Structure formats: C-alpha cells, structure tokens
Curated annotation (Swiss-Prot):
Component of the heptameric LSM1-LSM7 complex, which consists of LSM1, LSM2, LSM3, LSM4, LSM5, LSM6 and LSM7. Component of the heptameric LSM2-LSM8 complex, which consists of LSM2, LSM3, LSM4, LSM5, LSM6, LSM7 and LSM8. The LSm subunits form a seven-membered ring structure with a doughnut shape. This is U6 snRNA-associated Sm-like protein LSm6. Its main location: cytoplasm. It comes from Debaryomyces hansenii (strain ATCC 36239 / CBS 767 / BCRC 21394 / JCM 1990 / NBRC 0083 / IGC 2968). Belongs to the snRNP Sm proteins family. SmF/LSm6 subfamily. It holds the Pfam family LSM.
Length: 85
C-alpha cells in the first residue's frame, strides 16, 4: 500500500478571498474584466457582490493606456480577477 502525505505550510492559515481582499484595501491593484480591459488603481472598497471602487485609476485596453480616471466603480459581474499590483 502506498501512503499519501499531506503537505502543510507551517505558519500560514488557509484563508478565503474575502480575507485577502479586505487586507489589500488601500493598496494598488489590477482588475481585469471579462472583455480584456484592465484597470490599475488604489482599492477603496469591495462588497460581497465583488463590486469594486478604485481611486487614481488608469484604464488599459489591449495593453496600452487608454484613459485616466479619478474614481471608478466596477460592477462585480464584469470582474475576471483582482491582483495586488
């Protein structure tokens, strides 16, 4: 019989996405939408529906910067992913 070993990372807890997102509020993030558009800005707020508010936001279309915005509200159902920049 073969034995299966479970690896555990010492000192780290298994946390969900809501914990991660609450920890990065105020940080610079990249938000990619399903249509390929990306926004780079400071995460101000996020709710349970993944609705996002960014500040000092830059919009990138096809990898090129398209526009600069102050505040941006992004509806959660458009979000593909959020990453810390």
């Amino acid at each position: 019989m073969s034995s299966i070993k479970k690896e555990s990372s010492s000192g780290s807890e298994n946390t969900g996405p809501s914990v991660f997102l609450s920890e990065i509020i105020g940080s610079s993030v990249t938000v990619r939408l399903h249509n390929g558009v990306e926004y780079l800005g400071n995460l101000q707020s996020i709710d349970g529906y993944m609705n996002i508010v960014l500040d000092e936001t830059k919009e990138f279309v096809g990898g090129d910067q398209a526009r600069n915005y102050g505040d941006v509200f992004i509806r959660g159902n458009n979000v593909l992913y959020i990453s810390e920049a």
